[in-house]
From Swiss-Prot:
The lineage of its organism: Eukaryota, Viridiplantae, Streptophyta, Embryophyta, Tracheophyta. It comes from Solanum tuberosum (Potato). Homotetramer. Assembles into hexamers of homotetramers upon binding long DNA. It is found in: Mitochondrion. Belongs to the Whirly family. Keywords: DNA damage, DNA repair, DNA-binding, Mitochondrion, Transit peptide. This is Single-stranded DNA-binding protein WHY2, mitochondrial. It comes from the Eukaryota. Single-stranded DNA-binding protein that may be involved in the maintenance of mitochondrial genome stability by preventing break-induced DNA rearrangements. The keyword rRNA-binding does not apply.
Length: 238
């Protein structure tokens, strides 16, 4: 496994690297939501106060294509501290997918981004897909209320006819705002393989199960709060 020093590159070094979307309006590197370092190779050097900037990792996996861009990164779970001194899962983590549209050659509008949070089960569906399989997921924040159907999100993953990759599409219908947004990002077999492998690695972490195998005492005992701050952007904030 990579050493911590290789994982925590200074942010200014990242910004000097050229990306396919380097001219992007609101580049992913400048606007990506911070992911609190939680993987076992990083956590031991993370500052206990999650409100500080030390210990955050900027590491989305991004794919820039002609009509839209897509990035994926884990959002770690949050925990409540128990009076006994242990911690209990408060909210499970997710793999957050972010889509934003193209507004010109190598230009993308970050302000019009849409989010889709993959649960652990949905991640399992994605990583188990074969070359001819397809998956579709539906999210509705008001599904069990009288407002059901006002805002709907659907994510579909379908294979190319020639087997060279997949089309990942997000549709967001907001009847309150009278909007209907759709993004489609073609990904190659190699790009999908990266996502599948990364998601498989991240799965136990977003479930919080890594706490069973790696529980450094300082990460719990020094926490000043009963609730670990939730450093994730909620899917339905948009």
């Amino acid at each position: 496994m990579l050493k911590v020093s290789r994982l925590l590159h200074p942010r200014n070094q990242l910004l000097h690297k050229k990306l396919p979307g380097e001219c992007v309006k609101g580049s992913i590197w400048q606007h990506a939501i911070n992911t609190f370092a939680g993987f076992s190779t990083v956590r031991q050097n993370v500052v206990a106060d999650a409100g500080k900037r030390e210990g955050r990792v900027f590491a989305p996996y991004s794919v820039f294509k002609g009509k839209a861009a897509l990035s994926a990164e884990p959002r770690l779970p949050t925990f409540n501290r128990l009076d006994s001194g242990g911690v209990k899962l408060n909210r499970r983590g997710v793999i957050m997918l972010t889509f934003w549209p193209s507004v010109g050659e190598r230009k993308y509008d970050w302000e019009k981004r849409q989010l889709f949070a993959l649960s652990a089960t949905e991640v399992g569906s994605l990583i188990s897909m074969g070359t001819r399989d397809s998956s579709e997921f539906f999210h509705d924040p008001s599904m069990l209320s009288s407002n059901a159907g006002q805002v709907r999100k659907s994510l579909s993953i379908k294979p190319n006819a020639d087997g060279s990759g997949y089309f990942i599409s997000l549709s967001v219908v907001n009847n309150n705002l009278k909007t209907n947004d759709r993004f489609t990002v073609p990904v190659t077999t190699a790009e999908f393989a990266v996502m599948r492998t990364a998601f498989s690695f991240a799965l136990p972490h977003i479930m919080g199960w890594d706490r069973f195998t790696n529980r450094p005492s300082e990460s719990i005992s020094q926490s000043p709060s009963k609730v670990v701050p939730q450093l994730m952007e909620a899917e339905w904030d948009r």
